[in-house]
């Protein structure tokens, strides 16, 4: 699958996770509704599904990974920033096939697209500290 299709999968995952975080509906229902209502022609749907189920299943674990690096309480995070960070931390901790830099750069781009004005700086700051601990780079 092309990198652009994976990028679109991440974009869709941010939107679906945002909905899930606010609604607290079952993630399978959120996925079904999202796929029924959105144009997913250029999306790696399999990867979208993996991100959704992986983040939902591991959300407490992912939140625990980010907490030490947050400058505020987890509850004070915007829902977009939380979704973006959860996706990046999922990729860093559970998806060795996603290169380190790709996970971080994609998260920054997602925050620029969907987040508040400077949320990409916040996301970058958290991941800059968390990523080397979660997935140490080989020297």
UniProtKB/Swiss-Prot annotation:
The entry's keywords: RNA-binding, Transcription, Transcription antitermination, Transcription regulation
UniProt record, GO biological process: DNA-templated transcription termination; transcription antitermination
Keyword Transcription (UniProt): yes
InterPro entries the record matches: NusB-like_sf (IPR035926), NusB_fam (IPR011605), NusB_RsmB_TIM44 (IPR006027)
GO molecular function: RNA binding
The keyword RNA-binding is annotated on this UniProt entry: yes
Annotated coiled-coil segments of the chain: none
CDD domains reported in the protein's UniProt record: Terminator_NusB
GO CC term (a single one): cytosol
Pfam families referenced in this protein's UniProt entry, alphabetically: NusB
UniProt cross-references to Gene3D superfamilies, sorted A to Z: NusB-like (1.10.940.10)
Organism superkingdom: Bacteria
Signal peptide: none
Family (UniProt): Belongs to the NusB family.
Task of the protein: Involved in transcription antitermination. Required for transcription of ribosomal RNA (rRNA) genes. Binds specifically to the boxA antiterminator sequence of the ribosomal RNA (rrn) operons.
The protein, known as: Transcription antitermination protein NusB
Gene transcribed to yield this protein: nusB
């Amino acid at each position: 699958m092309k990198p652009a299709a994976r990028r679109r999968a991440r974009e869709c995952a941010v939107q679906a996770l945002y909905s899930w975080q606010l609604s607290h509906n079952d993630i399978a229902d959120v996925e079904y509704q999202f796929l029924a209502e959105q144009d997913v022609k250029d999306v790696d749907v399999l990867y979208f599904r993996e991100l959704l189920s992986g983040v939902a299943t591991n959300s407490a674990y992912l939140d625990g990974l980010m907490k030490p690096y947050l400058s505020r309480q987890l509850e004070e995070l915007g829902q977009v920033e939380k979704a973006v960070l959860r996706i990046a931390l999922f990729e860093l901790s559970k998806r060795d096939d996603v290169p380190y830099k790709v996970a971080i750069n994609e998260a920054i781009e997602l925050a620029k697209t969907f987040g508040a004005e400077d949320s990409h700086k916040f996301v970058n700051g958290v991941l800059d500290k968390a990523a080397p601990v979660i997935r140490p780079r080989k020297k």
